[in-house]
Amino acid sequence: MTWLYVTLGVIFGLILLCLITSLVCFFIVFYSPKRKTLGPDEYEIPPGKIYEPYRDYMISWARKARAMPHEDITITSYDGLTLFGRYVEQTKGAPIEILFHGYRGYGERDLSGAIDRCFSIGRNALIVDQRASGKSEGNVITFGAKEKYDCVAWANYVAQRFGPEQEIILCGVSMGGATVTMASSMELPENVVCTLADCPYSTASGIIKKIIKDLKLPVWLLFPFVKLGARIFGGFKLEDASPLEAVKNCKVPIIFIHGDSDDFIPHQMSDELYEACPSLKKIVKIEGAGHGLAFPTNKEKYYGALLDFEKQWRAYKEQKNAT
């Protein structure tokens, strides 16, 4: 019987090792601890050397956004989390952009500059803290698997509050771009007229594998534990965070914008999404722009792309309403 006990001990040990490794991977990749509260004169910019040249701009945008008249809004997610957003209005009745930030970011830090962009082209802005980020509740980042439902909930909130004539544009950067891309294939209110996906990834699995590879770690060894950690400890499947699958059923016009010098999320991922999308679409590459920096790198081209595509989706909307 000794061999049986040894065998069972080995099996139990392997299972325990797998669970511990998966738990470690879960905490590294998906877990978001309690966020610190910034003081009235404290501001942050995203980590990384590529953002240092834009530090003054980003802090200026955040300071300006904090001082603007605004309304703090909360909604409840489908699984009971309180989600936070900040609404800033320049022109009553103007289109509202609902903006979603990226991985481990939060609205004020990552999206304050988008307020000026929105105002410059006649739009109001609702800046959202995604689940497990900023002032929103939750501790698990799901790479869009659950965030896509939050996006739909925000769109429904705006539609119900502002009425059937209120135009809504879904906008996201990085993971936020992936989130709005996935939401664009779901049941959205008729108010949603367009989606802007800035530097999205095509699949959560793909971008996680890419990062593991960039760290010179064995993808074949670590990724299964990342995937298992998401399932066991995060309560979601990575396969449910696939913009590439979702975009095949995209129901609204969508514009993809990506910096061609993005070394975090390759711009080819936007190409994949563009090719798979059946709806009215446009793709724009910003030369020399790093990750999430397409707008500050070339504002003129960014504005031009948005305004050109607005003409297209308005014509599409008129044609659709006429039929």
Please tell me what each predicted stretch does.
Residues 141-162:
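Alpha/beta-hydrolase active-site loop
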Residues 12-76:
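An N-terminal hydrophobic leader/cap segment in hydrolases
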Residues 289-303:
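Catalytic histidine-centered segment of alpha/beta-hydrolase-like enzymes
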Residues 118-137:
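Conserved alpha/beta-hydrolase
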Residues 263-269:
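Conserved alpha/beta-hydrolase "acid-adjacent" motif
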Residues 249-251, 256-258, 262:
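Short beta-strand/loop motif that positions the catalytic acidic residue
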Residues 103-117, 130:
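The serine-hydrolase catalytic nucleophile loop
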Residues 182-236, 245:
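Hydrolase active-site cap/lid region
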